[in-house]
Curated annotation (Swiss-Prot):
One of its GO terms (molecular function) is IgE receptor activity. Expressed in gamma-delta T cells. This is Low affinity immunoglobulin gamma Fc region receptor III-A. Pfam families: Ig_2. It is found in: Cell membrane. Residues 23-105, 99-189 form the Ig-like C2-type domain. Residues 226-250 are cytoplasmic. Forms a heterooligomeric complex with ITAM-containing signaling subunits FCER1G. Interacts (via transmembrane domain) with signaling subunits; this interaction is a prerequisite for receptor complex expression on the cell surface and intracellular signal transduction. Binds the Fc region of antigen-complexed IgG. Residues 1-16 form the signal peptide. It comes from Bos taurus.
């Protein structure tokens, strides 16, 4: 005769099924790390993920279109504006990666930044990048129109520990040949302390909340059925095992 699974066993089965249905995602990495580049730069996109034995074939997508390259690294020797967009990859044993955006700009100077949104206390690194690595002299970095660093050559601007007041609009300027060139402005935002993020992370995403609610309902229903059928089975056994005594009337 069939028996109901205990509630805990049901939850374990559902949880295990949920985990196996979500394989690990691949990850796209940029080399160099900048996702804002100038035309004619070299860009390498690397796909990190699990591969089957002796098979490192990789799928690449650019703006949703499958690329012919099937190598773990996708190399662009002379990047063009049309190479801008979102890139995704997938290995043989991984789910498709989240998209990574690449922006190709036209100009003499480009202010490159590792992250445009930075947590308080984390470093900020800015690079005044020139087209085809043309020599640049008298480089200046500006925030909200005010000069923050000056160097005779081209050096990076590094802020060891970001503070809220470091948020703002940044650009760089320098001399190329006999011309004074400037980059486009880049908005950098320094986030509030981690405590605010900790509070917000206390609340689960909507799909996890839905899963917990469904599991709670299933647990309650299964528990009720489990004990109901158990009482019914016990009553049936007592009826079968009970003895009936007949007596003659007067």
């Amino acid at each position: 005769m069939w028996q109901l699974l205990p509630p805990a066993a049901l939850l374990l089965l559902v949880s295990a099924d949920t985990q196996t249905a979500d394989p690990s995602k691949a990850v796209v990495l940029l080399d160099p790390q900048w996702n804002h580049v100038l035309t004619n730069d070299r860009v390498t996109l690397k796909c990190q993920g699990d591969y089957p034995v002796e098979d490192n074939s990789t799928k690449w997508w650019h703006n949703g279109t499958l690329i012919s390259s099937q190598t773990p690294s996708y190399f662009i020797a002379d990047v063009k504006v049309q190479d801008s967009g979102e890139y995704k990859c997938q290995t043989g044993l991984s789910a498709p990666s989240d998209p990574v955006k690449l922006e190709v700009h036209v100009g003499w100077l480009l202010l490159q930044v590792a992250q445009r949104v930075v947590n308080v206390g984390k470093p900020i690194r800015l690079k005044c990048h020139s087209w085809k690595k043309t020599p640049v002299a008298k480089v200046q970095y500006f925030r909200n129109g005010r000069g923050k660093k000056y160097s005779h050559g081209n050096s990076d601007f590094h802020i060891p520990e970001a503070k809220l007041e470091h948020s703002g609009s940044y650009f760089c300027r320098g001399i190329i040949g006999s011309k004074n060139e400037s980059s486009e402005s880049v908005q950098i935002t320094v986030q509030a302390p981690e405590t605010l993020q900790t509070v917000s992370s206390f609340f689960l995403p909507w799909h996890q909340i839905t899963f917990c609610l469904v599991m709670g309902v299933l647990f309650a229903v299964d528990t009720g059925l489990y004990f109901s059928v158990r009482r019914h089975l016990q009553s049936s056994e007592e009826w079968r095992d009970g003895k009936v005594t007949w007596s003659k009337g007067p």
